[in-house]
Regions:
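Adenosine-nucleotide cofactor-binding segment
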Residues: 1-59
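Residues in the short beta-alpha loop(s) of Rossmann-like NAD(P)-binding domains
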Residues: 11, 76, 100
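Well-formed, non-transmembrane alpha-helical positions, independent of function
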Residues: 17, 37, 59-62, 86, ...
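Residues at the C-termini of beta-strands that transition into short coil/loop
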Residues: 30, 74, 98
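C-terminal hydrophobic helical "lid"/dimerization subdomain
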Residues: 58, 102-149
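Helix-to-beta-strand junctions that scaffold the AdoMet/dcAdoMet cofactor pocket
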Residues: 64-66
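Rossmann-fold dehydrogenase core element
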Residues: 69-71, 81-122
Length: 149
């Protein structure tokens, strides 16, 4: 598709995994001027925000190139603030997306099968149910949490 994948996270602890999964660049949002770094690469055509934070939306919108799209894929039920002017004058878009539609789920599964994509999961024993829940709630779980009975 011709995209250069840029991964962003709060710290460096996810860098190795992000690079292994195909990211060409990795920036810590707390240790670097990631907006400048992304703009220096030409700006982002699309940003997939999986873990929304109250103070990140404006910076992500700023990192988009003209006509770019910020896709909101996760929620934490908190408000996000951003500049309306940067959206209007930059011809930028914000879109929410959830995979509740059965046709979309089918397309995703077919894409995964066709491209031999295997899910990455974090397995917890049944007796570790509380730890799994706590890890998931606190953001420590890296992948989809699965309880093994």
């Amino acid at each position: 598709m011709g995209f250069k994948i840029v991964a962003l996270s709060r710290s460096e602890d996810k860098k190795d995994l992000a690079m292994k999964l195909g990211a060409k660049y990795y920036f810590s949002i707390e240790k670097s001027d990631f907006v400048k770094e992304i703009k220096d690469l030409g700006g982002a055509k699309a940003v997939l925000l999986t873990g929304p934070s109250e103070n990140i939306a404006d910076k992500l919108i700023e990192s988009l190139q003209e006509g770019g799209k910020l896709m909101l894929l996760g929620t934490n039920n908190k408000k996000m603030e951003f500049s309306i002017n940067s959206i209007i004058f930059g011809k930028k878009n914000i879109q929410g997306w959830v995979c509740f539609d059965n046709e979309v789920k089918k397309e995703c599964l077919e894409f995964s099968l066709k491209n031999e994509i295997k899910p990455m999961i974090q397995i917890y024993k049944f007796e570790d149910l509380q730890k799994g829940y706590d890890d998931m709630s606190s953001g420590l779980a890296r992948f989809r949490s699965v309880i093994k009975f």
